[in-house]
Amino acid sequence: MVNNRSSESTTTAVSSNGSPPKACAGCGGKIGDRFLLYSMDRYWHTRCLKCSCCQAQLGEIGTSCYTKSGMILCRNDYIRLFGNSGACNACGQSIPASEMVMRAQGSVYHLKCFTCATCRNRLVPGDRFHYVNGTIFCEHDRPTGLLNGHLNPLQSNPLQGSPMLPDQKVC
């Protein structure tokens, strides 16, 4: 099955008996094999439908394959790149493949849902924020324990040239 967040189709093995050869979406060659795959409204040699990351032949795996950002992915690589689900960590709603997202510690958010837990202001790329136990805080509303050093800090990716607290992140 192919999951494209906004639409689904199945990967189907089709017999090519008696029909003119189809062009493979992977290699462009004619498919003269007895069986071919039909996925994402295109035909594929069984050897050509591959994960864009690990090159696993998806016709052989017999499980789901996913497409996002122009890539065809096996389940493991989809989860590695885009998180466990295509759902927003804040609202639980699905996130369309074409939509921009915000990420924090492996969690994925709609842009509109990436807000401070205290003041509810939306954080935008470039804003500094604190991510404490799965909760987002803006710079102004960070928990007072962070100021006093009482909360365990999370690791962060420091912004070049700017000093940051251990739990501080940059969108």
From Swiss-Prot:
Q: Does the keyword Repeat feature in the UniProt annotation? A: yes
Q: Which domain of life is it from?
A: Eukaryota
| Domain (LIM zinc-binding) ranges | 22-84, 86-148
Instruction: Kindly give the PROSITE patterns that the UniProt entry links to this protein.
Output: LIM_DOMAIN_1, LIM_DOMAIN_2
As one GO molecular function, the record gives: transcription coregulator activity
InterPro entries the record matches = LMO_RBTN_TF (IPR050945), Znf_LIM (IPR001781)
The tissues in which it is expressed are: At the start of gastrulation (stage 10), expressed in the mesodermal marginal zone. Shortly after (stage 11), expression is down-regulated in the dorsal most region. During neurulation, expressed in the neural plate and ventral epidermis. At late neurula stages, also expressed more rostrally, and then in the brain, migrating neural crests and ventral epidermis.
Q: What is this protein called?
A: LIM domain transcription factor LMO4-A
Organism of derivation: Xenopus laevis (African clawed frog)
